[in-house]
Swiss-Prot record:
This is Translation initiation factor IF-3. GO terms for cellular component: cytosol; membrane. GO terms for biological process: ribosome disassembly. Monomer. Pfam families: IF3_C, IF3_N. Belongs to the IF-3 family. Keywords: Cytoplasm, Initiation factor, Protein biosynthesis. GO terms for molecular function: ribosome binding; translation initiation factor activity. It comes from Rickettsia prowazekii (strain Madrid E).
Length: 185
């Protein structure tokens, strides 16, 4: 039962995403554009369907919200293929920005500091944003200036590679700064 409903639902969704073609067009009159992109003007739907049939092509509703709707004579299979291909290319070009996090402590050693900086540089080269957080434990929170100094060291070490989205600020027991890769680099 579930499989049957799933198949029907998938077909319903896929058909609604496509423009109407041929006999699915319900308008009485349409603004017709032929296969050579020449405007014919407002034509009766029967006449438009006959012209498409004579050309061996389909009548496809391009702009359904216009009054009267705009229809074009073209190969519907080729149209579906090209629109699917354009959608695939657009998805390929999209870049998903990921927020990575690097945690520091106020009394970090030099070696650990440099290792974490190298990792931050890798994240930035991949085009990801980086959330740099500094965790205070116990009485360390009384010395916030240590945190500000650490963030200054990070800024100086990454100068030219980063653009600061959010400057260092306190959130509870942690200090946070968000950086992203500098577009110029």
């Amino acid at each position: 039962m579930y499989l049957f409903i799933n198949i029907i639902w998938r077909n319903f969704i896929s058909k609604n995403n496509l423009p109407k073609a041929n006999r699915e067009i319900k308008a009485k009159e349409v603004r017709l554009v032929d296969e050579n992109s020449e405007m014919y003007g407002v034509v009766n739907i029967r006449e438009a369907l006959d012209m498409a049939e004579r050309a061996g092509l389909d009548l496809v509703e391009i702009s359904p919200n216009a009054v009267p709707p705009v229809c074009k004579i073209l190969d519907f299979g080729k149209f579906k293929y090209e629109s699917k291909k354009r959608l695939h290319e657009a998805r390929k070009k999209q870049k998903v920005v990921v927020l990575k996090e690097m945690k520091f402590k106020p009394n970090i050693s030099i070696g650990d500091f440099e290792t974490k900086l190298r990792k931050i540089k890798e994240f930035l080269k991949d085009g990801d944003k980086v959330k740099i957080s500094l965790w205070f434990k116990g009485r360390e929170i009384l010395h916030k200036e240590v945190g500000h100094e650490l963030f200054k060291r990070i800024e100086l070490a990454l100068e030219g590679l980063i653009k600061i989205d959010q400057h260092a600020k306190m959130e509870g027991k942690q200090m946070i700064m968000i950086v992203s890769p500098d577009i110029k680099v």
